Each structure stands twice: as C-alpha cells, then as structure tokens.
Amino acid sequence: MGEKRLAKDRAWELDFLRGIALIMMLFMHTSWDFRYEFGVDIFSYLEAGWFWAFVHPVIVVLFVGVSGICSTFSRSNVKRGIKLLAATLVLNFGTLIIYKVTGIPCLIIFNVLSVLTCGIFLYALIQFIETKTGADPRIVNLVMGLAGLYIVICGCNIDYMNYCTDNILFIPFGFTIEGEPYMADYMPLFPWLGVFLIGCVVGRACYKDKKTLFANKVKAMKVISRPVEFIGRHSLIIYLAHQLVIYGILFVIFWLIRSAR
C-alpha cells in the first residue's frame, strides 16, 4: 500500500522532462557519431548556429535543472553525491584507458556528471548549514537563487574574457587552456552549476510536499509518458552506457558495409 502511494505521489513530470532531455541528448550524440566519427554527410544541424545557440542550451537546462529539483527530494544528497562521483570517476578513467590503448579520441575529463556531482555536494553542504544554523528557508532560497544567477551570468561571459592559462586545474571553470587535450564531452561549472542551484530553488519552492504537481494524469498521457519516464528514472545508467553502445553498433554496421564491398 505504501509503495503504491509513493508511486502515485512520485513527481512523474520530472522523470518525463529528464527523459525528454536524455532522448534529445542521445539523438545528438548519435548524430555526432554518424557525421564526425564515421564521416557520413548527414545531420548538418550540428554545424548550425541556431542549434548551439538555442536547442542545445534547452537540452542541458532541462537535464541539469531537473537534477537540481530532484536533489530537494533526496533524503541523503551525500550518498547520491558519492554514487555519482564513483560513476564519474569510472567514466573518466575508462575513457582515459580506451584513449591510451586504442587511440580513439574519447577522453572525458569534466562533463555533465562532474557538474551534477559538484552540485549535489554543494546542495548537501547548504542543507547542512541550513539545519545547523536554523536559517530561514526563504533567505536560503534567495541566496541560492542569486548565487545561481550570478554563476550563469559569469558563465555566459567567460568566452568574452579572453583569459587563457596553461593550468589544467582551470578546465572545470570553462577557461581556455593552452595545450588542452581533445575531450569527447565537456561541460564547465560556469554557467551550469548556476542552473543546478536555480533548479534546487524551484524544487524547494514548488515541491515542498515532495509530490507530483499533476496527480490527475489522464490515461492517454500515461501511455505516452511512461516510456519517457522510464528513461528519465534510469538516466544515469543510460548516460554511462549510451555512447559505448551507440558507437559499438555503428562500428559493427560500418565494418559490415565495408566488408561487403
């Protein structure tokens, strides 16, 4: 009975939004592999300014922002952070080994998982300070919102700072690094940590009861949303595995095509 109630109260709309973002991300990465890894002249949208200016930011805002909202539901963000840190390290060292052994340019140093890990640990620290000091939640929300907005604004202006360094420790912050190795995937803390914090504020303000805002979902919507919700609920596993699976399938397909000629 309790499990059914939890399932009914679960904020399915967050799973749905994260699932939509992940599907769009999967399509983008598949397009990238076709066009750049296997040299197929399709998916030219990847070279269009409108995609990187408008569509790509929407995908990332959905994924990172919803993750921030979901952090306000967690009983232990420290445990979530440790779990995500482990997954991030596996991905980083895994791609490093593959890059060194095969020469495939798949190295990942700092990406969306790294941003989410930092965001979750930061929010866990904020929760700890809030609990210990008895701070007014409204003040905490205001400070987090302003900090998030400041980080977003800074992140949007980093490209115009024309700051360059040879210190790789600046990679997480989005600065240009001299001699920076090619990274198959990259996402800096600025502006995306700010988006995460703003997501936390939205979660605290709109999901105080930690329940869905759309409890009376119609049957037609259930049929459409369930597969997407499933993807959203298992986003970490899918994200970790998707590029290896997609690249592997395409490698086999193109190998068979070349062998048949």
Identify the function of each model-found stretch.
Residues M1-R261:
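Alpha-helical transmembrane segments and their immediate juxtamembrane cytosolic regions
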